[in-house]
Regions:
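Catalytic-loop motifs flanking and including active-site residues across diverse enzymes
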Residues: 32, 118, 182
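Glycine-rich, aromatic-lined ligand/substrate-binding cores of catalytic
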Residues: 67-150, 154
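Conserved functional hotspot residues or short segments at active or partner-binding sites
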Residues: 123-192
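Structural recognition of the beta-strand scaffold that forms the well-ordered cores
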Residues: 1, 62, 121-122
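Glycine-rich, charge-decorated loop segments at or immediately adjacent to ligand/cofactor-binding or catalytic sites
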Residues: 2-15
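Short gly/pro-enriched beta-turn/loop segments at secondary-structure junctions
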Residues: 55-57, 113-118, 162-164
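Conserved anion/nucleotide-ligand pocket segment
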Residues: 14-97
Length: 192
């Protein structure tokens, strides 16, 4: 969904693998699923419980997509969207995920729109001063991303029915935005 030109973020360190960071590759890796499969297979990134296991290398065939170009977003492919997760209901959710998804793993630290109609688009909590948070984030002058104040009550999940305050983010220039770092700037701002 992010196209094939965006590559950014840290690589997971050995010993810190998880469901969302299984391989030593950047958080945003700029590859198609087929290219990723080839890289994992050819570079020996498959590993067993004790590390690299050459027996896990397989005979792999990848069929290239017709008409796809690296600069294309998912929407530009014209393909219908198929939900990879209930919390990623539309292509923009997948585009926003790298900007907030890590924050969502911190056990209810901040609500990122899950349980509401804006999954992966917000950073909010009951205790946040939304105006102060927006002002702090605006002072960082982050390229390609902007924030607006938001107040909402999730309709599902651990924050269901709670009035949350915070910011909704949106891209003003996706190519210029360092989307992976956004969530870390937000965490810095809420802890000031």
């Amino acid at each position: 969904p992010l196209g094939g030109l965006k590559v950014e973020g840290c690589c997971v360190e050995p010993g810190y693998y998880s469901f969302v960071s299984e391989f030593e590759i950047p958080y945003i890796y700029g590859l198609t699923v087929g290219e990723l499969a080839i890289m994992i297979n050819e570079e020996g990134l498959n590993r067993g419980e004790k590390g690299y296991d050459p027996a896990l290398k397989c005979k792999l065939s990848v069929i290239p997509m017709d008409g796809w170009r690296r600069k294309m977003s998912y929407i530009e492919t014209g393909l219908p969207w198929v939900l990879p997760s209930p919390n990623i209901p539309y292509p923009q959710s997948a585009v926003n995920y790298p900007s907030s998804g890590i924050t969502g793993e911190f056990n209810n630290y901040l609500n990122i729109g899950i349980g509401y109609t804006l999954p992966f688009e917000t950073f909010a909590a009951e205790w946040i001063d939304a105006g102060a948070l927006k002002k702090e984030l605006d002072s960082y002058n982050l390229p390609g991303i902007a924030f607006r104040i938001i107040h909402y009550k999730p309709i599902a999940g651990s924050s269901k029915g709670k009035l949350l305050h915070g910011v909704q983010f949106y891209y003003t220039d996706y190519e210029a935005a360092d989307i992976t770092l956004t969530q870390f700037y937000v965490m810095q701002a809420v802890n000031r």
